[in-house]
């Protein structure tokens, strides 16, 4: 099966910010520091113009006991409003980071959880799509499964636009590398996008490759491929900082781990399919484009350029190739059985 697929494969950014329990982002994106709630004002008896100072102070802060947080917000709010072009800003201090880091990283338990989920998804998907609604609907409409995954990603992106949801999203939809806030983030981060360009590129890649691959593999196999590639990307993303001995790492998010898995499986099964990068055809077909992406991601891990999560890309790519190899072997065995069965009649 060959065809022309347009791809603008989005990347999974490894953000350089750390969200912690004792700091928060207000709806106006101002900085809130962890400072004592109140502090009494000190009055010097011999201070000049004491009455004027007290009067001016009361105009600004009408209470005797005032919060230093309110002063910080009033002074620094204009600066932070000008400089915060992203969804979040750098918040925590290095001391807080060290305290969180010293608390330990459940990397082993996350790995066991990830492998268990991958096994459960692989063996449970056939039953799920055979007997459990609404998954049974996707068995006969595999393309709609792709649209459903696309819709979930868009919905989570919409939640990122609501400041009231940030605390929930920071806990469950960001994959923290040094201090895991929730084990659900190993999957949740794969459905999370904070910027429109990131969402748009990933969803275009999902639509380009996913609709064709879901029709060929079936809903159950495609769902297993997508979810396990996402989990593999998260596991690689967690292990890479430890193996590379990186001192400071930020959280990551995005569906690119799963999408590189889809690309890997597609290119393995259809190596000569034509690929368009934006509007330009890639020479050599899908397999050449995939190998180029692997080389680029490997170089990114080694040279550590940019802020993308190259390890997650590699993890998803390896899972996609593994699925492609397994499916090709299964198809070949079925073909041999059919030939043997047909030979008995002649």
Swiss-Prot record:
The chain crosses the membrane at residues 109-129, 145-165, 203-223, 246-266, 275-295, 308-328. Keywords: Hydrolase, Membrane, Mitochondrion, Mitochondrion inner membrane, Protease, Serine protease, Transit peptide, Transmembrane, Transmembrane helix. Residues 1-73 form a transit peptide. It catalyses: Cleaves type-1 transmembrane domains using a catalytic dyad composed of serine and histidine that are contributed by different transmembrane domains. Changing residue 313 to A: Abolishes protease activity. Belongs to the peptidase S54 family. This is Rhomboid protein 1, mitochondrial. It comes from Saccharomyces cerevisiae (strain ATCC 204508 / S288c). The lineage of its organism: Eukaryota, Fungi, Dikarya, Ascomycota, Saccharomycotina. The gene is PCP1.
């Amino acid at each position: 099966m060959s065809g022309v697929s347009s791809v603008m494969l989005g990347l999974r950014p490894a953000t350089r910010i750390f969200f912690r329990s004792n700091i928060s982002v207000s709806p106006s994106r101002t900085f809130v520091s962890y400072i004592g709630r109140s502090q009494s004002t000190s009055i010097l008896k011999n201070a000049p113009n004491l009455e004027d100072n007290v009067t001016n102070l009361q105009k600004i802060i009408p209470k005797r006991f005032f919060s230093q947080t309110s002063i910080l917000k009033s002074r620094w709010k204009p600066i932070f409003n000008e400089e915060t072009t992203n969804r979040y800003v750098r918040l925590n201090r290095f001391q807080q980071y060290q305290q969180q880091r010293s608390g330990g990283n459940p990397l082993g338990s996350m790995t066991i959880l990830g492998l268990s989920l991958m096994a459960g998804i692989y063996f449970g998907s056939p039953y799920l799509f055979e007997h459990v609604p609404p998954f049974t609907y996707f068995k006969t409409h595999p393309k709609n499964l792709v649209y459903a995954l696309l819709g979930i990603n868009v919905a989570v992106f919409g939640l990122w636009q609501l400041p009231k949801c940030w605390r929930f999203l920071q806990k469950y939809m960001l994959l923290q590398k040094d201090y895991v806030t929730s084990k659900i983030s190993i999957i949740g981060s794969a459905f999370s996008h904070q910027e429109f360009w990131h969402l748009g590129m990933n969803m275009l890649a999902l639509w380009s490759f996913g609709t064709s691959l879901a029709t060929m593999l079936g809903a159950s196999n495609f769902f297993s491929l997508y979810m396990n590639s996402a989990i593999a990307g998260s596991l690689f993303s967690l292990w890479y900082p430890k193996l590379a001995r990186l001192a400071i790492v930020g959280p990551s998010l995005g569906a690119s781990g799963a999408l590189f898995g889809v690309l890997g499986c597609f290119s393995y099964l259809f190596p000569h399919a034509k690929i368009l990068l934006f509007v330009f055809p890639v020479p050599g077909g899908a397999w050449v484009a995939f190998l180029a992406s692997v080389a680029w991601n490997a170089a990114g891990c080694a040279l550590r350029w940019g802020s993308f999560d190259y390890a997650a890309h590699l993890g998803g790519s390896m899972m996609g190739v593994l699925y492609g190899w397994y499916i090709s072997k299964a198809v070949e065995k079925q073909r041999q059985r059919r030939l043997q069965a047909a030979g008995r009649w002649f």
